[in-house]
Amino acid sequence: MKFVGAHVSAAGGVDQAVLRAHEIKATAFALFTKNQRQWKAAPLSTESIDKFKKNCEIYGYGPAQILPHDSYLINLGHPEEEALEKSRAAFLDEMQRCEQLGIELLNFHPGSHLKKIDVDKCLQRIAESINITLDKTQNVTAVIENTAGQGTNLGYRFEHLAAIIDGVEDKSRVGVCIDTCHTFAAGYDLRTVEDCEKTFAEFDNIVGFQYLKAMHLNDAKSELASRVDRHHSLGQGNIGKVPFTYIMQDIRFDGIPLILETINPDIWPEEIAWLKSQQTQ
């Protein structure tokens, strides 16, 4: 079964995200459990946690259908100790929020070396950050998102993801989220069925499909191998609709959140309906 949705707003409380997902007929959703552009946030109230769980129960969203995203400020591979510790503390808080809400996945961008340490050292730091956080939490899987490779961001090569996973001690609690826009911008083509076969075979060979825990379904304004992260609505960018049909018809993508982060929320209901329709083509 395919779980399809979008990254919805949690304005007014995390429980409201569930209602917004239901309104667009989503069978999965992503959200921020706190303000993504601030370091500090008030703890989740018991009332907010209870409302979130109740709404998920009412509208039929289980843990496999929910993909929270952490703060954009966090850099788990930061080259400077003080900033690294700040990021690690914030990441732990994000993981603990997921624990409180009964969510089993936390999606995050791996980190950036900022031209101050080498790639391998940065990847090692990211793995260490994950290990520290997993030791202090239970039941939540750290889901590494591949990146477009803008600036000094790592995670744009499948080898980066594999290296991080290799350094994580508890392999049962680490996984990957593949963003189609990022994948394309990083140089992995997806425009034809043959491209999809090749790219996902490479992913399986280097990382392994057993680690695929989620996907972000986005077309791209950016060009192939541009290392520029610019999302577009499905079928309106440089990728086209082929890979989205491919994903919807391939059982390897069953049972995980497939999340839109496309640029026009007004057409999310149509995009979700179209994706669902592709399963039976």
Swiss-Prot record:
This enzyme catalyses: Endonucleolytic cleavage to 5'-phosphooligonucleotide end-products
Single GO MF annotation: phosphoric diester hydrolase activity
- Any idea which positions bind Zn(2+) 2? 145, 179, 216, 261
Q: Which Gene3D superfamilies match?
A: Divalent-metal-dependent TIM barrel enzymes (3.20.20.150)
Q: What is its EC number?
A: 3.1.21.2
Alphabetic keyword roster = DNA damage, DNA repair, Endonuclease, Hydrolase, Metal-binding, Nuclease, Zinc
Task: Check the record and name the InterPro entries matching this protein.
Answer: AP_endonuc_2, AP_endonuc_F2_Zn_BS, Xyl_isomerase-like_sf, Xyl_isomerase-like_TIM-brl
Where, by residue number, does the polypeptide cross the bilayer? none
* CDD domains the record matches: AP2Ec (cd00019)
Which positions are annotated as binding Zn(2+) 1? 69, 109, 145
- Specify which residues bind Zn(2+) 3 according to the UniProt entry for this protein: 182, 229, 231
> How is the cofactor bound here?
Binds 3 Zn(2+) ions.
The Swiss-Prot or TrEMBL record lists the needed cofactor(s) as: Zn(2+)
What GO terms describe the biological role, i.e. biological process, of this protein?
A: base-excision repair
State whether keyword DNA damage applies: yes
> Would you identify the family this protein belongs to, as annotated?
Belongs to the AP endonuclease 2 family.
| Cited function | Endonuclease IV plays a role in DNA repair. It cleaves phosphodiester bonds at apurinic or apyrimidinic (AP) sites, generating a 3'-hydroxyl group and a 5'-terminal sugar phosphate.
Q: What is this protein called?
A: Probable endonuclease 4
Species this chain originates from: Proteus mirabilis (strain HI4320)
The gene is nfo
